[in-house]
């Protein structure tokens, strides 16, 4: 996120905190103060510095993990140094999911040819990642024929009845691509396959569920994947939460990298009958302790009314959590810091009337 975003949000939040009432207009002084905060935000590197400290200095921070504990300590220190008051934590006891070892292999499958069957393709080890909350496979893994679908909608078009679905007894693979969009809207359209695909596949008798990673890396020149080396560099599987229905027997769920999904799609297009083997060893319901981190810019005569701004402090385990949601943490913290510093310099009558409360939330990813 840009510092322009930080400046705009700082201005909006400041005006809300200083506002006289729901229908009140803003005085020239209020508008000038908001504009000055926006100017300071655009000239400041505080958000970038905070993001670097969190994403690079701490890195992955799943709820309850050592990285999460370091992030909680860092956040308290950062908010205090930014000038926020009443910095505190809120303890949360929870049970978390933990990733274990995972592996997947696409096994060679014969295809119809001019003279019977063409030779089988060579087996291919896939870059994969278990979806968050996925159950484990049996100790020796799961192997079955692949039932390929271009989208979740295509799977949903089949009856939720194993006897009437080709998913029955197979590993369902959803090959839904994420469309590139400046506003990230392609992610929203594709993520439903990750959230709902495993339970819908299970309703139809599937023994496991896989999907193309929700993301746009790999497979296109824009992503730096025009060469084999570029494609290999993009062989990264994207994780994220999935969910089960207690009324449906859960099945293992995983994602493969975009280039690996391209290989699966190409072999399907050539008419190959594919077999896939997958093995995962995950843990669920592991007791853990984490914390929300809270800080405030106190109000004056309307201090009991609160303007709440927040982001989530935790991240998944396979990356640094820079965008999700390190950028959010950095932006709201830096914006609140600007307001705290402005309030400290201002006379009492010019301070925000309402309390501005920052909450850096715990366990969003798996909560």
Where in the sequence are the language-model features?
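Boundary at the C-terminal end of the N-terminal hydrophobic targeting segment
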Residues: 14-19
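Acidic, glycine-rich active-site loops and adjacent beta-strand->loop/helix elements
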Residues: 177-179, 215-216, 313-315, 359-366
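Extracellular/luminal Protease-associated
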Residues: 65, 124-245, 250, 320, ...
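Noncatalytic luminal/extracellular "stalk/propeptide" segments of secretory-pathway proteins
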Residues: 24-26, 30, 52, 56-183
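N-terminal capping segment at the start of a domain
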Residues: 25-65, 222, 250-253, 314-315
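N-terminal export leaders
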Residues: 1-3
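Short helix-loop-beta-strand segments that form the rim/entrance of peptidase-like active sites
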Residues: 49, 337-367
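Soluble metallo-hydrolase cores and metallopeptidase-like ectodomains found primarily
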Residues: 31-33, 107-110, 128-160, 164, ...
